[in-house]
């Protein structure tokens, strides 16, 4: 028999923090060079004109302009920046 009462611990408290993924600047909105446009896991959206891609697949603006989302024949979503020129 146990001589000490077992001390239980909570079975909760393991929830991982949300990673705040998703579109940060939507189509038709202005974006400055360097702005993060989309945070994602894998290439859900692909980089188009004037958009760069980071090592964690984050899409960011290379130039300032208006954000444009397009879907091409291969059914991929592309994010581009339309500059004022």
Swiss-Prot record:
GO terms for cellular component: cytosolic large ribosomal subunit. GO terms for molecular function: structural constituent of ribosome. It comes from the Bacteria. Keywords: Ribonucleoprotein, Ribosomal protein. The keyword Iron-sulfur does not apply. The keyword Ribosomal protein applies. InterPro entries: Ribosomal_bL27, Ribosomal_bL27_CS. It holds the Pfam family Ribosomal_L27. One of its GO terms (biological process) is translation. Residues 1-21 are annotated as: Disordered. Belongs to the bacterial ribosomal protein bL27 family. This is Large ribosomal subunit protein bL27. It comes from Porphyromonas gingivalis (strain ATCC BAA-308 / W83). The lineage of its organism: Bacteria, Pseudomonadati, Bacteroidota, Bacteroidia, Bacteroidales. The gene is rpmA.
């Amino acid at each position: 028999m146990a001589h000490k009462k077992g001390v239980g611990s909570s079975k909760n408290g393991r929830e991982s923090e949300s990673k705040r993924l998703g579109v940060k600047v939507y189509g038709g909105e202005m974006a400055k060079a360097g702005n993060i446009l989309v945070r994602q896991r894998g290439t859900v959206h692909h980089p188009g004109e004037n958009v760069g891609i980071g090592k964690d697949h984050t899409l960011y603006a290379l130039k300032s302009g208006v954000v444009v989302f397009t879907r091409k024949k291969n059914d991929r979503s592309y994010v581009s920046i339309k500059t004022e020129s």
